[in-house]
Amino acid sequence: CKEYGKGIFILVKTSNKSSGELQDLKLENGTTIYEKVAELVNSWGENLVGEYGYSSVGAVVGATYPIQIKELREIMPKTYFLIPGYGAQGGKAEDIALGFKDGIGGIVNASRSLMLAYKSDKWKDKYSEKEFGKATRAEAIRMRDELNKEIID
């Protein structure tokens, strides 16, 4: 990362339901694989902390696991979190807020809930399939406001 001025995100605890099949396995010392990977991410990024207090080595931490989000923020206090799973996968804004510190430190990803917003109960009566872009925009604004309320307020 340092040599090329780039960043990287490492899969730590992903949002998919089957993530636990591997990431929740216990090591001999009793820690889980995701905890060990988090410790590695933290150590790899120690010497790569930038101007805003975060490392260029980031971690993917799923919104669908709020207990782990909080735990992983403690293990990786200077790591940017890429947080998938908000919306269609069931991740909630109040859970995602646990991955932020002072309103920063995370990038929230939502895909299906934006791409298919025109089909959702919230927007299907207002936007047609041809207006999917408008529905996507409306949902993105709604999500932004919901996240800001939990993260910043």
Give residue spans per PLM region.
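Generic structural signal for well-ordered, non-membrane alpha-helical segments
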Residues: G30, Y34, Y65, Q89, ...
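Surface-exposed amphipathic alpha-helices with a cationic face
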Residues: C1-K2, N42-E46, K70-M76, R144, ...
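Conserved anion-binding
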Residues: C1-G58
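A short, terminal or domain-edge coil/loop segment
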Residues: I10-E21, N109-D121, M143-E146
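Short, low-complexity, polar/charged sequence segments that are solvent-exposed and flexible
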Residues: K2-K6, L27-T31, K78-F81, F100-G103, ...
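C-terminal helical cap(s) of enzyme catalytic domains, especially alpha/beta-barrels
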Residues: I96-G105, L116-D153
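A C-terminal functional module that forms or caps the active site or interfaces directly
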Residues: A59, A63-N109, S113-S120
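Generic structural signal for well-ordered alpha-helices
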Residues: Y34, A38, N42, I69, ...
